[in-house]
């Protein structure tokens, strides 16, 4: 997946954000990563993949896509904050793990980025997140189209 334009569009969207002026770089980083954890949790909740009990509720694919795009926006914002916008593209790979394991791995990726921030950890986060999208049946075209439609 090509990321250059997504980073540029996210930068435009972020111009409207009013960031608290009393936050130092550490606190801002921590809050951005906490926000990412929340967005990923919202996505996991939408998929209902965590439920180990019988549930007759169906999942709404449009709602899942919305939550996926919200998390993607947050991931792009973290990448910009960390200065990783020179990543041109990421290959979307299939994953044999169940969806709940993929989400758990994503939380590990976020923690790795918090404790020992590096471009490699960010790339792993992107790869694992895009892999979740593929497991959800989302193609690159669907993801980009939904991202473009998001206000």
Regions found by a protein language model. Give the residues of each.
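Flexible "arm" and connector segments at domain edges
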Residues: 1-151
């Amino acid at each position: 997946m090509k990321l250059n334009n997504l980073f540029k569009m996210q930068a435009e969207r972020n111009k409207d954000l009013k960031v608290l002026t009393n936050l130092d770089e550490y606190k801002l980083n921590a809050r951005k990563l906490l926000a990412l954890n929340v967005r990923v949790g919202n996505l996991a909740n939408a998929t209902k993949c965590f439920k180990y009990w019988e549930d007759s509720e169906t999942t709404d694919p449009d709602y899942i896509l919305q939550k996926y795009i919200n998390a993607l926006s947050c991931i792009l914002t973290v990448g910009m904050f960390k200065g990783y916008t020179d990543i041109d593209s990421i290959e979307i790979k299939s994953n044999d793990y169940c969806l709940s394991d993929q989400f758990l791995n994503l939380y590990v990726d976020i923690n790795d980025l918090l404790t020992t921030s590096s471009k490699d950890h960010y790339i792993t986060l992107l790869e694992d997140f895009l892999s979740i999208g593929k497991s959800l049946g989302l193609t690159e075209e669907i993801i980009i189209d939904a991202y473009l439609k998001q206000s």
